[in-house]
Curated annotation (Swiss-Prot):
Keywords: Cytoplasm, Endonuclease, Hydrolase, Metal-binding, Nuclease. This is Protein pelota homolog. The N-terminal domain has the RNA-binding Sm fold. It harbors the endoribonuclease activity. Gene3D superfamilies: 3.30.1330.30, eRF1 domain 2, Pelota, domain A. It comes from Methanococcus maripaludis (strain C6 / ATCC BAA-1332). NCBIfam families: pelota (TIGR00111).
Amino acid sequence: MKIIQEIPERNIIKLIPENLDDLWHLSNIIQPYNAIYAVTERRTEDKGDKLRADRGTKRRVFLGIKAEKINFHEDFNRLRVSGKIIHAPDDIPIGSYHTIDIEPLLQVSVQKNWKKWDLARLKDAEDSSKKPKVVVVIMDDSEADIFLVREFGIKELASIKSGISKKLDYKQNEQAKFSYYSDIINSISEYEGKILFAGPGFGKNNIQNYISEKHKDLAPNVVIESANHTGKSGLSEILKSGIIDKIYGEARISKETQIIEKLLEEISKKGLAAYGIESVSNAMNYSAIDTLLLTDEYLRRNRRTIEELMNNVENINGNILIISTEHDAGKQLKALGGISALLRFPIE
């Protein structure tokens, strides 16, 4: 995320989302009644062509709308914000409806009553754009699963079978092995930065040797770690371990996974944790909340009613973490009601 300009006297921040992660951050920042300004396409009717059967022509115009609906479309790489027009050229009626499609590299101005957690989220997005992509290959001698670890979830890039079999002779298995390695390399070659290989057995070590010999340019970026499982279970193991943070710097999804693990541990021993709105609100009455945990879904559904609680947490110097339901940690928090807290001290 690029922050272009801040205009405090008007509560406006001009910014440019640079990737899908930034759009996801924006989907959690923009809320109903916020004003959004951007260059967008609007179909307008030509004054001299009212008898034509078509719906007019599209042209690019600078519009402002008051947000009513905010929809993040991962598959289409865009964030759609719909609402009534509040600023437009003279020939476009104020009060009519419009949808602004926010895509990477589109400059957007957001006008709202900025909260501390909104600004913290913008800072997170700005910092994360400077970090390399996190690519993890979980593999053994039979199969490799390749994942892109994003701010809001996991994308499986490829699942590759080795073709190695006891039914094949040595030469055929060697050919299958090198073809397997080549397919893996082709799937990760477009990503810059470190590539983490992990899994049980020696498959990860063997491909490291292959890369050192055949792809010397990639060799310095290869990191090898052990994991007891393959597939998504192996990835979950890596996320919980904190290894990704050591390699790439703090990754949001890794941080979220670890903090939910801590929450579940505290709940299991009836320790420093509260979950569900009633229990969390009670903890706030004692100023006991250290970290308030919310799923992005819960916040979007309940933002107007939950803001007082969030403000109170900030007033006692507590932390607020919004967790995506696109990955396992967020789904675990959702199962707890979508809202939980880690506490400073136990309460009855």
